[in-house]
Amino acid sequence: YVVGDVQKPGAYQLSSLSTMTNAIFISGGPTEVGSLRDIQLKRAGKHVSTLDLYKLFTQGDVTSDQRLQQGDVVFVNSVQSQVKIYGEVRRPAIYEVKSSDDIRSAIKLAGGLTSLAYPKNVLVTTLDENYQRAVKRIDLTDKRQQAKNSHALKAGDVVRVLPISQQFSKVVHVGGAV
């Protein structure tokens, strides 16, 4: 069975070599609200494994893609938390994040920083306790900041990685017949 937030939930006949990803593919994949990071395999009513498709897509890691057995249930959970990451990252997009993800792991999901990124100037727009938008400026290179706060992300946060400055300092322009 493939159930939960998938396009075509139901019972499927698969080959004995099929894995969780095969079952997800045959069911049409997750819906818009279906999680790509929390896909559970249940066998005889017990949780056996959780598949994170981001690991497959970004790292080619298939270690949690279990082979299916007769009577298994593949359950696609709903997305719990998403953040937007844009600016000087390789793959700007909206990403599903887990509660354990911080700003560094989210930027890693986005392919890492580009060569034009300024890691000392990352802006995180979040909602504070009073449901007001607040902007935090984060320096990813500051070791003290890393130690005291891992910059946990919340649902709806927006991360913007700013580019290095285009201005030059201490530059001498020489013109004319030199």
Predicted regions and their residues:
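Ser/Thr/Pro/Gly-biased, low-complexity, turn-/loop-rich segments
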Residues: 1-178
